[in-house]
């Protein structure tokens, strides 16, 4: 990533917090920057001490005997490496050392439920299967902004001691205590040990942790909204917290430390609601590298797909060994009505808890309240330093964007009505606000132009039913992957809009300086919220199948997902929006067949992407090599639960996908292949063989799918579904073929 200023977006309660940061941090050491020095796997010899080795390397490169201020992190548990402050010339010398696998800058990353689990069918009661004793031995590692340990969602009432496999520690720092629910905590953000604390000061980490594994807490709500029982997917599971994010963002070198510790601590699933601001190659992606090491020892990494949709090729979680999650809306939404002076009611979206008591306030358009120093276009957007306080004080301000809402409140506005850029989600603000659709916003402007004294009031929010759910959220990042064209990303979709979950009272629900509210539960949106839903489902599946590998769990969730849709046309409305579909926790525990992958399969896949042996080792951390034969591996033949290929849109093509399934259903079963094509499909799809006869558990059988067509064009991907059915199980795999101009 190029040096310079990037923006980090923290999706806390629908608030976009913009923070300026430098991609490779410069500090007080002149032109030194923080780099991650990756040395691969840990040597097996007993006398090897990583820390001493890392310090020795630094002393050799820098020529300095005292290098404590240079060494930032030492990775010494699950893989080998360190982070250090280096000059450019020192970086080059390090990169040239034979034993150094790679040196890359520590980048900034960004942070990206009362009804959501019920919506997915995972309801509490006798109809939902649970194995509490095994669930209690399950540990979810949450890499995020910390946690508020005093929340009822993390009470350890009824919990026994941590599982025997737990090897971690509670290093939460000052004002932080672990218990038998939150069994581990570490902080990587503090500049000194004295300031270390895993406490969550943004609310984001608390929210995500409770979605994955929070206790069932009755009467949870946000000022009465969303009232119900908030709980995680596996309420009896344990939580280990790894704080890598603060108000300056999330450092890549801290992320690597979190992976190093989490893997060694013994977690079963890792949930990361954090994404890079750009899309680096795997060998420079701390999540991809850390997750590869996790996968190699049986730990599944679940990652948010990103919040940069609906633009195509914005999904940042692209490695096939990382479970990438898109966000969907559920069957519940929040609205805030706007009542005009003439009695007309407009339906807006908002999580508004403020009551105007039915009082009508004067309306003023931002562009009509502009300072002379500001252009009308900027004032129309209510941009900072554009509004005249005398003209907005005591009024409801109309804004064409959210940019100046805090400014309007600061100048004395009593509320605001905003043109909604994302009509499928509601926002929390620090004073009365309603977000209107384009049509309703035009109606409001028309009303203002038709009367001398336009007035309105904004009502408190109400809950409404969303009959269109599940539907992919507009903001959810889309594929196809810009790194790997023949792997469908994102993988799966889960609830990520207006999710009520635990929150940290150490932060306001909007992080606005004017917001004095402190809450125990709040409503947030983003793929950050979708990610822990899938982490919870993965942990739930693992309680029934403790010996399953990460790829088996991922396959079970993907092949049992609900088919779904996305609004719009072209790429943004296809599987590149929602992957395999919407997660179904109940069916995922009994998939029938799974597509299994090993570390060796992923290495062959990387070789097929033309990775050299040197680049391969950056990710694998071992002595793997790419031979000529292995390098002929087609990436689309990775044994993935979906099938995707990029082709020429104007020429005939004939491509094949090779797959192998493992029987995890009934000992003796016969699966028949069925191809479901959409109306008007130009694809010819053949499956060989069309029948798979399984005679034993864990038996593997292979098949080939051949897809051909004269041409498909470049505007609309063409897709179908392959379903293997034995009458009980329906193992569904999307097939998508596309071309891009």
Swiss-Prot record:
Listed EC numbers: 3.4.21.-
Tagged with keyword GTP-binding: no
What are the record keywords, sorted? Autocatalytic cleavage, Glycoprotein, Hydrolase, Protease, Secreted, Serine protease, Signal, Zymogen
- Inhibitor I9 domain: from which residue to which, for each copy? 34-111
Signal peptide per UniProt = 1-24
Gene Ontology cellular component terms for the protein in this record: extracellular region
Domain PA, first and last residues per copy: 359-445
| MF annotations from Gene Ontology | serine-type endopeptidase activity
Name its cellular compartments: Secreted
Active site location: 144, 204, 528
Question: Which residues are part of the propeptide segment?
Answer: 25-112
Pfam families per the record?
A: fn3_6, Inhibitor_I9, Peptidase_S8
Task: Please list the residues annotated as glycosylated.
Answer: 175, 195, 227, 357, 449, 565, 610, 623, 654
Can you supply a Gene Ontology BP term from the record? proteolysis
Name of this chain's protein: Subtilisin-like protease SBT4.4
Q: Which organism is it from?
A: Arabidopsis thaliana
């Amino acid at each position: 990533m190029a040096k310079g200023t990037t923006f980090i977006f923290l999706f806390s309660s629908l608030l976009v917090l913009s923070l300026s940061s430098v991609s490779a941090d410069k500090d007080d050491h002149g032109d030194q920057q923080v780099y991650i020095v990756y040395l691969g796997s840990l040597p097996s010899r007993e006398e090897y001490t990583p820390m001493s080795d890392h310090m020795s390397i630094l002393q050799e490169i820098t020529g300095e005997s005292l290098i404590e201020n240079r060494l930032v992190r030492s990775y010494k548990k699950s893989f080998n490496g360190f982070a250090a402050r280096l000059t450019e010339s020192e970086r080059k010398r390090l990169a040239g050392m034979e034993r150094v696998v790679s040196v890359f800058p520590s980048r900034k990353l960004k942070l990206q439920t009362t009804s959501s689990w019920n919506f997915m069918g995972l309801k509490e009661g006798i109809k939902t299967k649970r194995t509490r004793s095994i669930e209690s031995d399950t540990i979810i590692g949450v890499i995020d902004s910390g946690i508020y340990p005093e929340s009822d969602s993390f009470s350890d009432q009824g919990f026994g001691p941590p599982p025997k496999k737990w090897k971690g520690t509670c290093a939460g720092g000052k004002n932080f205590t672990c218990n038998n629910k939150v069994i581990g905590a570490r902080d990587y953000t503090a500049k000194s040990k004295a300031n270390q604390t895993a406490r969550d000061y943004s609310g984001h980490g608390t929210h995500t942790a409770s979605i994955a594994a929070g206790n069932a807490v009755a009467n949870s709500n946000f000022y009465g909204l969303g009232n119900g029982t908030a709980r995680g997917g596996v309420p009896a599971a344990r939580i280990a917290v790894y704080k890598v994010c603060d108000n300056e963002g999330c450092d890549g070198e801290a992320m690597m430390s979190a992976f190093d510790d989490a893997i060694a601590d013994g977690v079963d699933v890792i949930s990361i609601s954090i994404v890079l601001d750009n899309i680096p190659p795997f060998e420079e992606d701390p999540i991809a590298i850390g997750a590869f090491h996790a996968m190699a020892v049986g730990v599944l990494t679940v990652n948010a797909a990103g919040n940069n949709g609906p633009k195509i090729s914005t999904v940042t979680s692209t490695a096939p060994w990382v479970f990438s999650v898109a966000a969907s809306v559920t069957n519940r939404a929040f609205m805030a009505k706007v009542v005009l002076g003439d009695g007309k009611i407009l339906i807006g979206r908002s999580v508004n808890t403020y009551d105007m008591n039915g009082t009508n306030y004067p309306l003023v358009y931002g562009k009509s309240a502009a300072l002379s120093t500001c252009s009308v276009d900027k004032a129309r957007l209510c941009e900072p330093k554009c509004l005249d306080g005398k003209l907005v004080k005591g009024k409801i301000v109309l804004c064409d964007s959210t940019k100046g809402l805090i400014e309007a409140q600061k100048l004395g506005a009593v509320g605001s009505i905003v043109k909604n850029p994302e009509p499928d989600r509601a926002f929390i603000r620090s004073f009365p606000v309603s977000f209107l659709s384009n049509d309703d916003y035009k109606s409001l402007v028309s009303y203002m132009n038709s009367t001398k004294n336009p007035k309105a009031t904004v009502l408190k929010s109400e809950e409404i039913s969303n009959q269109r759910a599940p539907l992919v959220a507009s903001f959810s990042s889309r594929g196809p992957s810009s790194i790997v064209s023949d792997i469908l990303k994102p993988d799966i979709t889960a609830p990520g809009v207006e999710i009520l979950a635990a929150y940290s009272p150490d932060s306001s629900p909007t992080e606005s300086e004017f917001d004095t509210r402190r809450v125990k539960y709040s409503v947030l949106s983003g793929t950050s919220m979708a990610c822990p839903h899938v982490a919870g489902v993965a942990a739930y599946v693992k309680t029934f199948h403790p010996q399953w590998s990460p790829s088996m769990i991922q396959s079970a969730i993907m092949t049992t997902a609900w088919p779904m849709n996305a609004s719009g046309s072209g790429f943004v409305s296809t599987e590149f929006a929602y992957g395999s579909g919407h997660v179904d926790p109940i069916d995922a525990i009994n998939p029938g067949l799974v597509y299994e992958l090993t570390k060796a399969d992923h290495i062959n896949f990387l070789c097929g992407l033309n990775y050299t042996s040197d680049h391969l080792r950056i990710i694998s951390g071992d002595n793997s090599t790419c031979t000529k034969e292995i390098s002929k591996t087609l990436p689309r033949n990775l044994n993935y639960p979906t099938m995707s290929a990029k082709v020429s849109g104007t020429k005939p093509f004939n491509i094949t996908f090779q797959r192998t399934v493992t029987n995890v259903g009934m000992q003796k079963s016969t699966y028949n292949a069925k191809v479901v094509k959409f109306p008007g499909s130009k694809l010819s799809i053949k499956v060989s063989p069309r029948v798979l006869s399984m005679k034993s558990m864990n038996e593997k059988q292979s098949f080939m799918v051949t897809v051909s067509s004269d041409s498909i064009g470049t505007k609309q991907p063409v897709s179908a579904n392959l379903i293997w059915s034995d009458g009980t199980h329906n193992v569904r795999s999307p097939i998508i073929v596309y071309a891009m101009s």
